[in-house]
A protein has these predicted regions:
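Conserved active-site regions of diverse hydrolases
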Residues: 2-223
Length: 223
């Protein structure tokens, strides 16, 4: 188990180092866009009618401002990745936070306003999945297709702020994107046969293939 964890850690470091090599000598990463489920959600579910909320204790007990909607006691994966990149860049450039372009946590789509969207937006939503119906028994959620639509709306707002689509595209082409989703398509869909029909319609192999195909199409839309 330890060897497996070490392998994952080494792989993660290599990926990040490869990212650093790619951006070395280039302009700073200006923005950070986050898509996913509760592992990355930082407050988008707070005002939704859903059981999947984390804006109350003991969530956030180790976060500076208390509960924020993150499904953790402190920072979530998206926050940690941003901070890890900050540390790596600091070792190399000594002014990494300025290089990355992030001077604060990325705001959730639900509360992102004005020019702060230019540094990035977090669209993740607890209980969300690749499939639109996933997690519906828990209440409202922002499934991946809707997160992508929200990103499209953000881009339109960016065009208004920047002044034209060409400049906006140039800005977006240097941004960092992270997507973490799919577990709810099992634990809050396929493995809940009393609520969802996917378990009776597809074998495990067929369902996995279906998810991969739909996810691939969604990534193409994002790109």
């Amino acid at each position: 188990m330890i060897a497996r964890v070490n392998n994952v850690t080494i792989t993660t470091i290599l990926i990040i180092l490869n990212f650093i090599i790619l951006v070395h000598g280039a302009s700073k990463v200006p923005c950070y866009f986050i898509f996913g489920d509760s592992l990355l959600d930082n407050g988008n579910n707070n005002n939704l009618n859903t059981e999947a909320k984390a804006n109350y204790p003991p969530y956030g007990i180790d976060f500076p401002n208390g509960p924020t909607g993150r499904f953790t006691n402190g920072r979530n994966m998206a926050d940690i990745l941003g901070h890890f990149l900050f540390l790596i860049f600091r070792l190399i450039y000594f002014d990494s936070w300025e290089l990355l372009g992030f001077d604060d946590y990325i705001p959730p789509f639900a509360s992102a306003i004005g020019r702060e969207i230019l540094q990035g937006v977090n669209y993740a939503s607890g209980s969300a999945g690749i499939r639109n119906e996933t997690g519906s028994h828990l209440g409202n959620r922002i499934f991946l297709d809707l997160q992508l639509q929200n990103h499209h709306n953000t881009i339109l707002r960016m065009v208004d702020l920047v002044g034209n689509r060409v400049a906006t595209n140039a800005h977006l082409n240097t941004c960092l994107y992270i997507v973490g989703i799919g577990s709810n398509d099992y634990i809050n869909n396929y493995l809940v046969p009393k609520r969802y029909s996917t378990n009776s319609l597809y074998t495990p192999s067929q369902y996995a293939t279906l998810l991969v195909q739909q996810y691939a199409q969604q990534l193409k839309v994002q790109h």
